[in-house]
Amino acid sequence: MTQGKITASAAMLNVLKTWGVDTIYGIPSGTLSSLMDALAEDKDIRFLQVRHEETGALAAVMQAKFGGSIGVAVGSGGPGATHLINGVYDAAMDNTPFLAILGSRPVNELNMDAFQELNQNPMYNGIAVYNKRVAYAEQLPKVIDEACRAAVSKKGPAVVEIPVNFGFQEIDENSYYGSGSYERSFIAPALNEVEIDKAVEILNNAERPVIYAGFGGVKAGEVITELSRKIKAPIITTGKNFEAFEWNYEGLTGSAYRVGWKPANEVVFEADTVLFLGSNFPFAEVYEAFKNTEKFIQVDIDPYKLGKRHALDASILGDAGQAAKAILDKVNPVESTPWWRANVKNNQNWRDYMNKLEGKTEGELQLYQVYNAINKHADQDAIYSIDVGNTTQTSTRHLHMTPKNMWRTSPLFATMGIALPGGIAAKKDNPDRQVWNIMGDGAFNMCYPDVITNVQYDLPVINLVFSNAEYGFIKNKYEDTNKHLFGVDFTNADYAKIAEAQGAVGFTVDRIEDIDAVVAEAVKLNKEGKTVVIDARITQHRPLPVEVLELDPKLHSEEAIKAFKEKYEAEELVPFRLFLEEEGLQSRAIK
């Protein structure tokens, strides 16, 4: 190295350090050779080698979702760059900072149809918050700093393509800087007291209020719960916000639509007033969720979101938790009401049903009993990396979460195969916490080669695989919409043996009588530093479809209700309308 000089790749790594980056995920390649040379000599940033670039991208995105620094993943020019796309799109749709670094042929080979040359930047147009190709070596650290600043400030993915020769070139060591250490904490806008007072007046006059609490209030669960108790308003929450609340809070109705609970899917149509806190319910229009709502109050930190899902009677720009506290301080307390009592009864009826399924002690193994064992043996502050489909749906129903936990997935993009990559990142940043990757066999089939990544880097996690040889969530959808259940079944492998072949510990379990002991042993081995895969061979029993309930005799025949209850083992479930009538109220949704 020439005195007073530094390679552009080494300068780039120094910039990344100012942004808190300690890990780069990826696979080495020729078009990343200058970066790999710099990483080999760097003492602070670890290169975490994955078996597929998509795993690296998703791990980097989930790193930020779990509260870590901006995640960084690299891909070779051409194939590697295309493999990063899933991570880029998940970051974009979940408003998550992420930096994708793309390798590229040397600059003198570009536009010459060289080996693996691809016009890469257009792939990310329209989705990346920053998308550039480095033009010369001195520009490299500056562009990386710009990319990180854009990703963090705009909460999305940034993409940088680097011709490989630039990274080898030397630049002046004082010709660059990184801005990641500068104070940039976002200060929420001051709340508009006029709008707060409007909201308070609306809630004071509401007869059937509901709080719809989104992820914007994930750190304000205690305040939102206190507000719920004070005004006797049940809480609907979004799927990714369950950790904000105590799972057994009597006023929690769960989430609405398909990935949800029965109570939430009923109460949303019965409420006259909705306090929409930090949420962007994507099924609102499709589901006509608020068609019976008379008054709608929305709080959001993003002015674009205000009014997106419903016409507003009070519009509050600001932090959801701060707004909830401001309303809590001013709103009138409410004694127990028929509306509240009906909701508490409905919630308990649903929990009794959940507990019955979870507590079975004999018969074929279902996913419900697996969750029961997890709840029994998981640490109180366990981290859950959750895959999509039935796993998302059922984890929100059956995991007994509290604000001590973290639960993350791909909620809007819903890309299958995200749980295992997420667990890599979660364990890397939280080495002293227990990490569970919970997924179906379809998701595990997409990413199981990276079980060995946990083994290689001593990142012990527990992989829980619900194995029933089908794409269950899609099959269930086809059951409601299609003539044929086509293309949804597949042949499974022995996942325990796959785990063992990668240096992990594998278990296979297919009996209710054995699940508790298997999970207990898996937890014990995990605490001893082992990565574990549990192949839980469950039935193909469909979880109850809360979006198409057939329980109310005013809507369905006696035969249809009987068949529905038998199919879903739901003999004790009662339609919300009957609880309302017990309290002297009439349904607004069912006439």
UniProtKB/Swiss-Prot annotation:
Entry keywords, A to Z: FAD, Flavoprotein, Magnesium, Metal-binding, Oxidoreductase, Thiamine pyrophosphate
Name of the molecule in the record: Pyruvate oxidase
Gene of this entry: spxB
Chain positions covered by the region annotation Thiamine pyrophosphate binding: 337-591
Any one Pfam family match given in the protein's UniProt record, by short name: TPP_enzyme_M
NCBIfam families xref list: pyruv_oxi_spxB
Co-factor requirement: FAD; Mg(2+); thiamine diphosphate
Name of the top EC class for this enzyme: oxidoreductase
